[in-house]
UniProtKB/Swiss-Prot annotation:
Keyword Transmembrane recorded: yes
Pfam families documented for this protein: MIP (PF00230)
Organism: Mus musculus
Entry's free-text remark on domains: Aquaporins contain two tandem repeats each containing three membrane-spanning domains and a pore-forming loop with the signature motif Asn-Pro-Ala (NPA).
Protein's name according to its UniProt entry: Aquaporin-12
Gene behind the chain: Aqp12
Length: 290
């Protein structure tokens, strides 16, 4: 139980520090710099740090701390509730940034800046989290610091099946995100948190259900067991393909690339009035008939 308390304190401290950094950067930086870089970097750091600590609980908790799947899934749900409330509009996910680009909601320079911020934030969180584990504040952190040099791959299936799993998770996530984008935050955040928890339960045993290239790169790309190209296929190509399919299914086309709707018939905005014929038009028709 002491190890769980330490992990809960880690989650709380991470979210609190990131919230302070978020508010400070919002107050000190220009609005454009904050929206396109600082907000994304802090959000990615918060997500990556919590994901790394959650991975310790998932891998070591059941046998070292006696944690059951019900507790772990509850923590996943609560963490994503907190992320959804505190991210201040940041996605912390490269596929969401690419979706905004394909939907003509962001320019190319802005998208590249968001992508670089997400990668840097996730990598910084990985380094800081490992430093925290080195303090050995709990038995789980002690075990994790001893095993850090010998991490195992999160890909526990074939590359093709891993691509399908990550692509399917990303597809359902983005389709839900597109459907809920105009709904209230009080409905959108719990719905997405529940979806992420469900996918963590179903797809976690196969790929850990990242559906986030920046997060996967910071957590598992350096681990032995698979090549960098195999990791890229599963955790980058799979999610990007799933995102594109979700946009196509929702929109019928990719607005950035082409305007022709492939799936849905577009109705005309103007309707021809269907009123009664005037007497003059009736006479004209009668003359034509003669």
């Amino acid at each position: 139980m002491a190890s769980l308390n330490v992990s809960l304190c880690f989650f709380f401290a991470t979210c609190a520090i990131c919230e302070v950094a978020r508010r400070a950067s919002k107050a000190l930086l220009p609005a454009g710099t904050y929206a396109s870089f600082a907000r994304g970097a802090v959000g990615a750091a918060q997500l990556a740090a919590c994901c790394l600590e959650m991975r310790v609980l998932v891998e070591l908790g059941p046998w070292a701390g006696g944690f059951g799947p019900d507790l772990l899934l509850t923590l996943v749900f609560l963490l994503f509730l907190v992320h959804g409330v505190t991210f201040d509009g940041a996605s912390a996910n490269p596929t969401v940034a690419l979706q905004e680009f394909l939907m003509v909601e962001a320019s190319l320079p802005n998208t590249l800046l968001k992508l670089s911020a997400q990668v840097l934030g996730a990598q910084a969180a990985c380094a800081l989290t490992q430093r925290c584990w080195a303090w050995e504040l709990s038995e789980l952190h002690l075990l994790q610091s001893l095993m850090a040099a010998h991490c195992s791959s999160t890909l526990r299936t074939s590359v093709l099946q891993g691509m399908l799993v990550e692509g399917a998770c990303t597809f359902f996530f983005h389709l839900s995100l597109l459907h809920l984008q105009h709904s209230l935050l009080v409905y959108r955040v719990p719905a997405l948190a529940l979806l992420v928890t469900l996918m963590a339960y179903t797809a976690g045993p196969y790929t850990s259900a990242f559906f986030n290239p920046a997060l996967a790169a910071s957590v598992t790309f350096h681990c032995p067991g698979n090549t960098l190209l195999e990791y890229a296929h599963v955790y980058c190509l799979g999610p990007v393909a799933g995102m594109i399919l979700a946009v196509l299914l929702h929109q019928g086309h990719l607005p950035r690339l082409f305007q022709r709707n492939l799936f849905y018939r577009q109705k005309s905005k103007y309707r021809t009035p269907r009123g009664k014929l005037s007497p003059g038009s009736v006479d004209a028709k009668m003359h034509k008939g003669e």
